[in-house]
Amino acid sequence: MYKATVIIKLKKGVLNPEGRTIQRALNFLGFNNVKEVQTYKMIDIIMEGENEEKVKEEVEEMCKKLLANPVIHDYEIKVEKIE
C-alpha cells in the first residue's frame, strides 16, 4: 500500500481571494505583521500499486484529469510506502 500526497496551489500571478480574505481578517484582529497568506489544497490518496514510481505516474494522471486545473494550478506529488 502507498500513500500519495498531492499539494495543489495556485500558480504565481493567479489571484487568491481566500488567502487575501484571511490576511485581511488577521490584520483586523490585530496581526498587522501578516502581509500575505497563501492557501493550498492537500489530498491524501491511499492506494495499492506496483512500486512508488507507478503510483506517482497514476496519481499524475489523476491530477491531470480531475484533481488540478493546469491553467491555474501547480501541484506536487509525494509518495510513501505504508503498512
Swiss-Prot record:
It catalyses: N(2)-formyl-N(1)-(5-phospho-beta-D-ribosyl)glycinamide + L-glutamine + ATP + H2O = 2-formamido-N(1)-(5-O-phospho-beta-D-ribosyl)acetamidine + L-glutamate + ADP + phosphate + H(+). InterPro entries: PurS, PurS-like_sf. It is found in: Cytoplasm. Belongs to the PurS family. Gene3D superfamilies: Phosphoribosylformylglycinamidine synthase subunit PurS. It comes from Methanocaldococcus jannaschii (strain ATCC 43067 / DSM 2661 / JAL-1 / JCM 10045 / NBRC 100440) (Methanococcus jannaschii). This is Phosphoribosylformylglycinamidine synthase subunit PurS. The lineage of its organism: Archaea, Methanobacteriati, Methanobacteriota, Methanomada group, Methanococci. The keyword Nucleus does not apply. It is an enzyme of class 6 (ligase). Homodimer. Part of the FGAM synthase complex composed of 1 PurL, 1 PurQ and 2 PurS subunits. Pathway: Purine metabolism; IMP biosynthesis via de novo pathway; 5-amino-1-(5-phospho-D-ribosyl)imidazole from N(2)-formyl-N(1)-(5-phospho-D-ribosyl)glycinamide: step 1/2. Part of the phosphoribosylformylglycinamidine synthase complex involved in the purines biosynthetic pathway. Catalyzes the ATP-dependent conversion of formylglycinamide ribonucleotide (FGAR) and glutamine to yield formylglycinamidine ribonucleotide (FGAM) and glutamate. The FGAM synthase complex is composed of three subunits. PurQ produces an ammonia molecule by converting glutamine to glutamate. PurL transfers the ammonia molecule to FGAR to form FGAM in an ATP-dependent manner. Its main location: cytoplasm.
